[in-house]
């Protein structure tokens, strides 16, 4: 006698289950927008549904265990499709995920689904996560920045202007003593911070403990001479979590105010763990985004940096590198302005002109300082102040240490240029348009600035941006 049929076995099209164009997203849903280039001959609705399925509940065939759960509740839903301006191959797919799919406070769990195996799925030729809407209920379960912008300003007693920093160069090869000397010269010249570069860990030429001690000596000497709070981002990145904590504890023990982590190479869970430690121990946390361009630069495959910025705000950093627009590194101006808003503001409205697809409510979560770093010098100062505003960190590496008169002179030139631009802005002047006049006037009483302007007057990085906003192709 044949057994009664309990379910329909076999393979069926994803769109039968995961394409719901009538679905109205809930406030509690995670929303994602993917840029999809489907395989030839695969309909858009099928590709969108396949991404929704593979990033939520589905496997490649119907399984009887679907009957043991509420598949209708737990599945991801592709609910809308849009054309990508200027790209006939690609389209946007909007997908909603129910709150029950994810562990509270675990960014790792959320993105293991959203950008996990689905990115190797054969049904699509390329796939890019362009934006996500993090529901407020999930935001409130995440730690966020250890301290945030306002607490950091109070700790440093610095207000009304961007903070000024410098990455020590050469990034590799200096002894700890010479490295500390470079830190001291920069700080006494007028900078607020100096910084380890991302790949300065504990190499044979300079072990981490020696570097920390010489840098802290430089900080204390510069503070005593200038009367200002100073700091150096001591990179605690290491091969194990135990080693990271060991370095962080030592930095705290010697009295440094801020440490640094390379959050993509050490991982999100490690960064969130260190962020919690920083909050508990009163340490500021500077976050470097080394490796981000591997993930976000290809305009058709990967993860847009605005998503990485949201992730970092959730897991918790006080500073995050954001690009410069005007320097040597990739950065579309409109997109960068959108990233800055997402790092700092409590509520960000959807704005396609800045690449922001969804409203984002951060509740009471503190904001992060966006960090402009990479190929910038005094001539860029008017644009940087205009783009980034006061709540930012402007870091000039070669643009400080490359000064013909040395580090202290380079730091002095940048500090004078910064204060001249802030003063002009506060007086209502259009500082980007009048930048040359503002800097030239300031240089009359600052020979260090005059020499810096002469040194870098011809230096430009005129390369086209690879990852442009799609709206610019219209």
From Swiss-Prot:
- Catalytic residues as annotated in Swiss-Prot or TrEMBL: 169, 288
**Which additional comment does the entry carry?**
The basic functional RuBisCO is composed of a large chain homodimer in a 'head-to-tail' conformation. In form I RuBisCO this homodimer is arranged in a barrel-like tetramer with the small subunits forming a tetrameric 'cap' on each end of the 'barrel'.
State the protein's purpose.
RuBisCO catalyzes two reactions: the carboxylation of D-ribulose 1,5-bisphosphate, the primary event in carbon dioxide fixation, as well as the oxidative fragmentation of the pentose substrate. Both reactions occur simultaneously and in competition at the same active site.
Q: What is this protein's name?
A: Ribulose bisphosphate carboxylase large chain
Concerning InterPro entries, the annotation shows:
RuBisCO, RuBisCo_large_chain_AS, RuBisCO_lsu_C, RuBisCO_lsu_C_sf, RuBisCO_lsu_fd_N, RuBisCO_lsu_N_sf, RuBisCO_lsuI
Give a yes or no for keyword Transit peptide in this entry.
no
Organism, scientific name:
Hydrogenophilus thermoluteolus (Pseudomonas hydrogenothermophila)
Cofactor requirement? Mg(2+)
Q: Which superkingdom is the protein from?
A: Bacteria
Q: Which GO terms describe its molecular function?
A: magnesium ion binding; monooxygenase activity; ribulose-bisphosphate carboxylase activity
Asked if Lyase is a keyword of the record, the answer is yes
| Alphabetical keyword list | Calvin cycle, Carbon dioxide fixation, Lyase, Magnesium, Metal-binding, Monooxygenase, Oxidoreductase
UniProt: Mg(2+) binding residues: 195, 197-198
